[in-house]
A protein has these predicted regions:
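N-terminal secretory signal peptides and thylakoid transit peptides that target proteins
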Residues: 4-22
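Extracytoplasmic/periplasmic substrate-recognition and gating elements
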Residues: 67-73, 96, 100-105, 209, ...
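Long, aromatic- and glycine/proline-rich binding clefts that accommodate carbohydrate-like moieties
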Residues: 73, 168-172, 178-180, 350-354, ...
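Helix-loop-helix "hinge/cap" segment bordering the ligand-binding cleft or interdomain interface
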Residues: 96, 100-101, 157-160, 180-254, ...
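Ligand-binding pocket segment of bilobal, Venus flytrap-like solute-binding proteins
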Residues: 142-143, 234, 281-344, 390-407
């Protein structure tokens, strides 16, 4: 991973307010959390078939060096808008300005994550009803790549500017060796990094408990984590010193997955590199899951609803002083801005990189990506080629420096474009510095897989819950997770 000059980022920051109707390049980051928004779609049929034909748009002059896509209508399914209300407004403005500037029309399906990981998208793809371009977490694209609906990056790499691609080259080993290794190389292009496993904590709770934030935050290892959490709970003003996360959609990925990866490297993944075996029952996983469960069951540092606790609850409960420390995912950043206000601005609540348990890795990220799709079976090749070019022009917007410089505020993600990192603002809450340190130290990442959702969520989730509630031991949970994964994969 690339290095950088580690600068202290302690200055106060302005919480940017929503600017309704602002232009893309001037839009401020709206605050607030977003769930899966109700899907909405403009006129036109699915992009995979005959729908979304060209024509009907007023021709405009393209900027120098751009492809002329005026009059082209293409299908775009967009999921990233649910990161926050600010992200939704930002992206709607982005699309509107793209259409105005190019004369193309993006036939939008504004949707959320549920349809991607559930049955809706895959059923539509199988019925030849799919877009020309979509956004999603890279690890959720395996079913669509495996069905040969996604165009690999190498097939259109030459159509992206060299100077743009150069800022994303640092991610290519992660795609080639981990994410898309199953298909021989990178299939999609990342534009945003959703950070998993960072710490957030109340610095005033540390001080009231007699702890030193400069040396006790973040905790150095698992033993130190338990020690700090215990001190916060027994001597600080909060009710719970270290809140665990295990709610639906968050089961094991926020914790303890980043800890397993940091402890065991590739042994902390859920599959071997060649996908010939599941790893949930190895020593790394059993040790980490046991330590995770012990934080709640043995040390009592997490609240009574831990078995169902979601990380979206953290900002409000941390603002109220109920919990002192936890591991919220980075998209909670806009919610912290909205719900915490001055305590966030002045550094009372701060972020830090996640646990380093020996490998140097301090958490991981989900890359949010843009994917280009192949033509539908009934789509005219000439029409498809124009729609494909329009889709690539839209991808360029997501990868552009102007857009990348705004993602941290509007969506709580680290921009994937490397050259904008050093210009991220100094903040007292330290979010951007923490996320950057995590990205720079990332060594291994989960493989994309057609059955990723089952392997990462559906199989482990029930067993991690039973381990938290004490119905089964952590070791038994690991054994059952591995057994079910092997059965699913036919191993």
């Amino acid at each position: 991973m690339p290095g950088s000059d580690r600068r202290g980022r302690l200055s106060r920051r302005r919480v940017i307010q929503t600017t309704a109707g602002a232009s893309l390049l001037g839009i401020a980051g709206c605050t607030g959390g977003g769930g899966d928004s109700t899907p909405t779609q403009t006129s036109g049929d699915g992009g995979g078939g005959d729908g979304g034909g060209d024509g009907g748009a007023t021709k405009t002059t393209t900027q120098a060096g751009e492809v002329d896509i005026s009059g082209v209508t293409f299908e775009f399914w967009e999921t990233f808008n649910v990161q926050s209300r600010g992200a939704e407004e930002f992206l709607r403005t982005l699309v509107s300005e793209f259409e105005e500037r190019t004369g193309a029309t993006a036939n939008m399906n504004w949707t959320g994550y549920g349809p991607v990981i559930g049955a809706e998208w895959i059923n539509r793809f199988k019925n030849d009803d799919y877009p020309h371009v979509f956004t999603a977490a890279s690890q959720w694209t395996g079913r669509f790549i495996d069905g040969d609906w996604v165009v690999p990056l190498d097939e259109y790499r030459d159509e992206l500017p060299d100077e743009m691609l150069a800022q994303y080259e640092w991610t290519e080993p992660l795609y080639n060796d981990y994410i898309d290794q199953m298909w021989g190389g990178q299939q999609t292009v990342p534009f945003a990094l959703q950070m998993i496993g960072p710490f957030a904590a109340r610095m005033d709770h540390f001080e009231e408990a007699g702890l030193d934030p400069s040396s006790d935050f973040p905790p150095e290892d698992m033993e130190h984590l338990v020690e700090v959490g215990t001190t916060l709970q027994e001597q600080g003003p909060g009710e719970y010193g270290m809140q665990l996360i295990n709610g639906g959609g968050d089961q094991i990925d926020a914790q303890p997955v980043p800890w397993a990866m940091s402890k065991g490297g590739e042994e902390g993944l859920f599959l071997t590199q060649d996908r010939s075996d599941a790893l949930y029952d190895n020593d790394t996983w059993k040790e980490i899951l046991s330590q995770w469960v012990a934080i709640y069951r043995e040390h009592g540092l997490s609240g009574p609803n831990t078995s169902q606790y979601q990380d979206e609850q953290i900002p409000a409960q941390m603002a109220a002083g109920r919990i002192s420390m936890s591991n919220p995912e980075s998209p909670n950043h806009p919610t912290f801005q909205e719900q915490v206000g001055e305590m966030y601005e002045n550094g009372t609540i701060q972020w830090a990189p996640g646990l380093d348990l020996g490998t140097g890795q301090k958490g991981y990220f989900f890359p949010q990506c843009v994917a280009i799709c192949r033509p539908g079976p009934n789509e005219n090749q000439r029409d498809y080629e124009r729609r494909r070019k329009a889709s690539i022009e839209m991808m360029k917007v997501f990868l552009s420096e102007d857009v990348q410089r705004q993602l941290h505020e509007v969506a709580g993600v680290l921009p994937a474009r490397r050259d904008v990192w050093d210009d991220l603002p100094d903040t007292a809450h330290n979010a951007y510095d923490a996320w950057q340190e995590m990205a720079e130290n990332l060594q291994v990442l989960h493989h994309n897989h057609p059955q990723y959702v089952e392997l990462m969520y559906n199989i482990p989730g029930p067993y991690s819950t039973q381990a938290i509630t004490g119905d089964i031991s952590p070791e038994e949970a690991c054994d059952r997770m591995a057994r079910d994964a092997r059965e699913l994969l036919g191993l």
